[in-house]
């Protein structure tokens, strides 16, 4: 069996604390294999809520979409600019669509060798209501996927 070669790693981020912990795994592997990293943030479609009374005046959808785009464009360089990424080749991508679908698409289009993704560790009703992006990526990706669970993140 030939030695495993990892030249490119896809690191999806939603800017959460869990996603930040996956950085340790991705950057460590990138250093070990002299691999590049693609740091990806996916902006999911906004579905207007019906009957939500938390806002006195709802934001118009184009304004909210623009805010999400601006926020991602501001946050992604901050993530990639952290010390963990020093001396690594890193590309930033912002995509639009369903998170798991876009992660799998970018991985395939870019020919990445490994996806390192954080799991939020939801179970029960939370998982039913919100789904599992990591689980969907594992099921549909054509390359290996390393899932960093919240417990693993806290141990490292």
PLM segments and residue spans:
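A short acidic, glycine-rich active-site loop
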Residues: 58-74
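Small/aliphatic-rich secondary-structure junction motif
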Residues: 2-58
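Structural beta-alpha unit
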Residues: 1-4, 32, 80-115, 152-156
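Aromatic/hydrophobic pocket-lining residues that form π-stacking "cages" and hydrophobic walls in ligand
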Residues: 26, 79, 103, 137
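General small-molecule cofactor/ligand-binding pocket signal
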Residues: 40, 91-95, 146
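N-terminal Rossmann-like dinucleotide/flavin-binding domain of flavoprotein oxidoreductases
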Residues: 69-85
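Short beta->alpha linker loops
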Residues: 71, 94-98, 120
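Gly/Ser-rich helix-loop-strand patches that form or flank binding pockets
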Residues: 105-156
């Amino acid at each position: 069996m030939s030695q495993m070669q990892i030249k490119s790693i896809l690191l999806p981020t939603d800017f959460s604390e869990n996603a930040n912990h996956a950085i340790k795994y991705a950057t460590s592997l990138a250093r070990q294999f002299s691999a590049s990293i693609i740091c990806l943030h996916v902006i999911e479609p906004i579905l207007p809520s019906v009957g939500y009374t938390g806002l006195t005046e709802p934001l118009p959808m184009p304004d909210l979409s623009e805010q999400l785009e601006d926020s991602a464009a501001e946050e992604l360089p901050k993530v990639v600019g952290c010390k963990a990424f020093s001396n690594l080749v890193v590309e930033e991508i912002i995509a639009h669509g369903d998170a798991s679908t876009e992660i799998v698409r970018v991985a395939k289009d870019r020919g990445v060798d490994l996806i390192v993704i954080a799991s939020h560790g939801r179970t029960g009703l939370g998982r039913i209501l919100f789904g599992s992006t990591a689980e969907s990526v594992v099921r549909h990706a054509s390359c290996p996927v390393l899932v960093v669970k919240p417990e693993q993140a806290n141990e490292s």
